[in-house]
Design a protein with these regions (language model features):
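Glycine-rich His-Gly loop
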Residues: 33, 44-48
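Short glycine-rich or small-residue beta-strand-to-loop segments that form or flank ligand, phosphate
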Residues: 39-45, 141, 145
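Di-metal (Zn2+ and/or Mg2+/Mn2+) metal-binding site signature of metallo-dependent hydrolases
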Residues: 47-55
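A short, Lys/Arg-enriched amphipathic alpha-helix followed by its capping loop at the start of a domain
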Residues: 56-69
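Proline/glycine-enriched tight loop/beta-turn segments at coil->beta junctions
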Residues: 33-39
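Active-site/substrate-binding loop(s) of hydrolase catalytic cores
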Residues: 51-52, 67-204
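Active-site neighborhood of phospho(di)ester-bond hydrolases with catalytic His/Asp-centered motifs
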Residues: 42-44, 74-76, 176, 215-217
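C-terminal accessory segments enriched in acidic
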Residues: 1-30, 63, 150, 154-269
Length: 269
């Protein structure tokens, strides 16, 4: 990703050395503007089976230049989840994009940390520090682990390091990019912490004026572990999660293949 707009990079393990040398570590790209200004963090792939966020993050790294302030981008927020895909879903291992420089190949990963890196799942996952109980498999879901645990499992450690990065760099805005099935109630939507509602409302109006139909949802205060809740509660950042639809996640879909991932078109939807 060496591009003109990138002014530096570092590893997430700088904020938790226990991640170094593991698949929980990942690269953070930095794009500094010509003048001082606010800072923003983009989490590209919390769930690597949701490729639009990955492509958005890569596009920022490869093509974005910053005039004022600093942009931080993590294209592979859950790096371990790129090393496998979800069992019994018949998902493709890769998808390909045709570009002016030739064909580019990208990994279609999993929603969760690889069990080779974190096993076994408990029967019940207890989120820290809220004490909320969730299904045991959610222990490998990066978006159920915030604000993280320094001596926790790999997923909790990655969440902890991202939270510490936000605190250290005094990140003003954090955007977490996602996809979901068309039947999921929160799609084509932004979910914002109460501290970020004014920001998200202004963004929504701008997007609708540009012809993008999107809704705004408040972050549930009692649903814990998610970026839009915990990063707003435990740091000073303004967190917003963005969710778009793709039938490749849907329960009603037909063949799960590369064409479906890329086009988002399925005859059953």
């Amino acid at each position: 990703f060496s591009r003109e707009g990138v002014t530096g990079s570092f590893m997430l393990s700088e904020y938790l050395p226990a991640l170094k040398g593991t698949y929980g570590d990942t690269t953070v790209y930095v794009m500094e503007g010509r003048t001082d200004g606010p800072s923003m963090l983009v989490l590209g792939v919390t769930h690597p089976n949701e490729p639009s966020g990955h492509m958005a993050a890569i596009s920022l790294v490869e093509h974005c230049t910053v005039d004022s302030g600093t942009l931080y981008v993590i294209p592979r927020a859950n790096n371990s989840a790129f090393t496998h895909n979800d069992a019994q879903e018949a998902s493709p291992h890769f998808y390909h994009l045709q570009t002016a420089s030739g064909t580019r190949e990208f990994v279609f990963g999993s929603r969760a940390t690889n069990p080779l890196d974190q096993w076994p799942d408990p029967d019940v996952y207890t989120h820290q520090p809220s004490g909320q109980n969730l299904s045991g498999s959610e222990t490998r879901n990066l978006n159920r682990g915030y604000p993280g645990v320094a001596n926790g499992n790999m997923t909790e450690r990655a969440c902890y390091a991202i939270t510490e990065l936000i605190k250290d760099k005094e990140i003003d805005i954090t955007v977490d990019l996602h996809e979901s099935s068309p039947e999921y109630p929160t799609i084509n939507a932004m979910v914002a912490h109460e501290s970020a509602m004014e920001l998200a409302s202004n963004a929504l109006l701008d997007m609708m004026l540009d012809g993008v139909q999107i809704s705004l949802e408040p972050s549930p205060p009692t649903l814990h572990g998610l970026t839009h809740r915990e990063l707003g509660d435990f740091t000073d950042t303004l967190p917003v999660l963005m969710e778009t639809a793709n039938p490749s996640h849907g329960r009603l879909r037909g063949a799960t293949n590369e064409e479906l991932v890329l086009t988002g078109k399925d005859p059953y939807y």
